[in-house]
């Protein structure tokens, strides 16, 4: 009897260790499920309103609202590759209209009504420091982080009201 109880005790101890080990594996596995992919994209936009204020120092404060369609590649399954975005930007321009700093915020939504708030900017006169980052999301974008580099893609219309912006960066799901 004593040896049976000892075996039973050893078995229970082994079973507890096995259960604890499996629970640990599942807990760590949930951390591993977060996935980061590189996405690229192009925004095709139209400036809807522009307000320019010449300041006493000769610089110009520019405020724009725009609408753009974002076409992306490299997204994880379940995330549509097209988004509709409503954005606002503010920039300070020199008397020669060189960029002295620009910042923007966008609300981007997909066909399901899910979306996120994206912000970005560029402090460089040649627009070489363009960056973006998501700050909040809802629906399938809740907990998703996006960040990367962007570049002005050029004007599409002669008056500059239609334009493109390209980007590449990380898209991390929770």
Regions of interest found by a model, annotated:
Residues 1-11:
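Short, Lys/Arg-enriched N-terminal segments with co-localized hydrophobic residues
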Residues 10-19:
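Bacterial N-terminal signal peptides that target proteins for export
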Residues 11, 26-34:
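Sec/Tat signal peptide C-region and signal peptidase I cleavage site
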Residues 33-174:
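Beta-strand-enriched cores of mature, soluble protein domains
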């Amino acid at each position: 009897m004593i040896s049976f109880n000892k075996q039973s005790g050893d078995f229970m101890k082994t079973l507890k260790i096995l259960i604890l080990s499996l629970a640990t594996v599942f807990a760590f596995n949930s951390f591993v499920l977060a996935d980061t992919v590189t996405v690229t994209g192009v925004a095709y936009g139209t400036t809807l309103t522009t307000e320019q204020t010449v300041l006493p120092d000769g610089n110009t404060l520019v405020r724009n609202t725009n609408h753009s369609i974002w076409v992306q590649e490299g997204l994880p399954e379940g995330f549509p590759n097209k988004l509709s975005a409503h954005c606002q930007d503010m920039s300070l321009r020199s008397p020669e209209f060189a960029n002295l700093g620009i910042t923007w915020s966008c609300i981007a939504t997909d066909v399901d009504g899910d979306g996120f708030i994206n912000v970005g900017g560029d402090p460089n006169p040649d627009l070489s420091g363009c960056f973006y980052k998501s700050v909040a999301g809802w629906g399938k974008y809740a907990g998703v982080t996006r960040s990367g580099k962007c570049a002005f893609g050029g004007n599409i219309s002669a008056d500059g009201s239609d334009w493109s912006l390209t980007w590449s960066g990380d898209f991390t799901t929770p």
